[in-house]
Amino acid sequence: MRKINILLLLAIVALTYSCNETTNTTPDTLTDTANEQKSIITMLDSFNSAAAKADYKTYFNFYTEDAIFAGTDATERWDKKAFMVWAKPIFDKGSAWNFTALERHIYFDKSGTLAWFDELLNTQMKICRGSGVLVKQGNEWKVQQYILSTTVPNEILDSVIKIKSTIEDSIINNLIR
């Protein structure tokens, strides 16, 4: 009887450990994350380069079909199709916008198929912040959502608020009606 109890106890312990989900924290996982991060850095640099070259097709190929773009103006929130319509005349002039990353932070969800980032950009508007959500589709990372924000130094924020108040008060009033 005692041998049966010991065998039963060992079987329960073995079953318990075999059923536990483990997270792979081997160097391979770290390598995969580093490789995915490099892939995203390359993708974002190419994304910005396509806009600088006014390569309309390549630039918009970086977006998912149901992507959202939010620009620096409070009225600029477009799905991909609307953003393409808005941007087409700008790209047709032969130069769109030229953004260069100054600093970039990239994060991943546990599945490794969703990432989000924020970056400081050197632009014609001076320093802007880009942030977004990326999804992995096949072997490619695609922009699901991108938000472009201008930065305003705290020392001059009160002056900027005064300048934009009339325009944005009108937008606020339209939105709360």
Where are these regions (language model features)?
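Surface-exposed, charged secondary-structure patches
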Residues: 82-127
